[in-house]
């Protein structure tokens, strides 16, 4: 049994990482490693009571027990009147291709833990200024297995709809029953995490409308929400501007080469909808880099993440349902199934300060309803 919250002292870590001596890609890897090691040693306990959260899973086994502190990256000290429930992206990557590797990461899988803890700093931290950020660990599908399922079926639904969704559902039950205390909330994720957020929106909140009505917004970033999704699940609404509430906010970021070649991108699905994270429009109105309040990028010389200007403009490309940018950044997503110039890994960081401001704006709009 745990008390809400378990705090991981990650606020501000990105501003005080030690300087690293390596150059190039090795330095990038060291930055992520440093982020992870900082988070690993930062656990401490604070206050809120809870009961056991072990539940029978939809797939027939036992979901993860979220009454155990080891099941959470963070249950924060409550200092805000709005929460964020964040689901991290695929971190079980390289080791998932090893011979005999399981399809799903165990909760103590070192590669997954490091990736999740690093992603807290680069992505989930954007919600810290306005909300209490909750982040569960979950048994996620490995990159190898997700790729195999996608090859067979055309999507990764079968990979995430069992074990992974069972864990997220159990984590949500624990959160709402023991830690939320009736506060409004945001749910957010990236990549595989966002695909799970979609499952939550489509299924969990349909089963729990009393919880859904307190949702400020859902940030389904780095995975597609499509027109078909909205037709099939009429209780879902996509954002139409910068301050509507109870809505889905989503985009996938690409460079001009992906668009020019009409390249296949695993997260850009047919019928996808993206909102422009600079001007918050759904049409193809161009937003110049001058509207970008700051990107959150690694400084390879200093060995830390910092707010900077990389010329990250944004424009919706309606025929692909993505955002295209001319950002001055030479590190597109490595996996070939994202296309030659996808900025999948930078969906949050390119538009970090605009997203932070948008979170505050939607919360203010929710309060004034």
Predicted segments — roles?
Residues 3-27:
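Short, Lys/Arg-enriched N-terminal segments with co-localized hydrophobic residues
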Residues 27-35:
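Bacterial N-terminal signal peptides that target proteins for export
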Residues 46-47:
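C-terminal motif of bacterial Sec signal peptides marking the signal peptidase cleavage site
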Residues 51-113:
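N-terminal low-complexity, Ser/Thr- and acidic-residue-enriched intrinsically disordered segments
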Residues 88-183, 327-369:
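Active-site catalytic motif of lipid deacylating hydrolases and related acyltransferases
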Residues 166-181, 203-352, 356-365, 369:
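Surface cap/lid and interfacial helix-loop subdomains adjacent to catalytic sites
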Residues 189, 193:
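Gly/Ala-rich beta-loop-alpha elbow adjacent to hydrolase catalytic centers
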Residues 196-200:
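Hydrolases whose catalytic domains are alpha/beta-hydrolase-1, hotdog thioesterase
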């Amino acid at each position: 049994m745990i008390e809400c919250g378990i705090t991981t002292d990650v606020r501000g870590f990105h501003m005080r990482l030690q300087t690293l001596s390596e150059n190039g890609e090795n330095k990038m890897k060291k930055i992520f490693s440093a982020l992870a090691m900082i988070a690993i040693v930062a656990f401490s306990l604070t206050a809120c009571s809870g009961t056991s959260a072990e539940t029978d899973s939809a797939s027939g086994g036992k979901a993860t027990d979220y009454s155990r502190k080891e099941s959470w990256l963070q249950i924060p000290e409550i200092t805000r009147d709005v929460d964020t429930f964040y689901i991290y992206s695929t971190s079980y990557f390289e080791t998932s291709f090893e011979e005999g590797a399981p399809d799903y990461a165990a909760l103590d899988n070192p590669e997954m833990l490091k990736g999740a803890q690093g992603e807290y700093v680069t992505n989930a931290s954007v919600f810290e200024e306005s909300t209490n950020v909750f982040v569960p660990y979950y048994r996620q599908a490995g990159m190898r297995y997700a790729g195999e399922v996608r090859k067979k079926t055309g999507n990764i639904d079968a990979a995430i709809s069992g074990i992974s969704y069972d864990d997220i559902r159990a984590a949500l039950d624990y959160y709402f029953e023991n830690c939320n205390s009736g506060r409004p909330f945001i749910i957010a994720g990236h990549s595989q995490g966002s695909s799970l957020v979609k499952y939550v929106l489509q299924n969990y909140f349909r089963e729990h409308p009393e919880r859904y009505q307190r949702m400020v917004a859902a940030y389904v970033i780095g995975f597609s929400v499509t027109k078909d999704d909205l037709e099939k699940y009429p209780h879902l609404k996509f954002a139409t501007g910068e301050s509507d509430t109870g809505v889905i906010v989503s985009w996938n970021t690409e460079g001009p080469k992906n668009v020019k070649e009409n390249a296949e991108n695993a997260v850009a699905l047919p019928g996808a909808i993206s909102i422009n994270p600079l001007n918050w429009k759904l049409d193809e109105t161009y937003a110049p880099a001058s509207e970008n309040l700051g990107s959150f990028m690694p400084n390879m010389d200093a060995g830390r993440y910092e707010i900077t200007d990389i010329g990250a403009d944004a424009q919706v490309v309606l025929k692909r349902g993505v955002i295209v940018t001319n950002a001055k950044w030479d590190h597109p997503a490595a996996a070939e199934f994202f296309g030659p110039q996808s900025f999948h890994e930078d969906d949050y960081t390119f538009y970090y300060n605009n997203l932070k401001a948008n979170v505050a704006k939607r919360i203010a709009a929710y309060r004034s309803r």
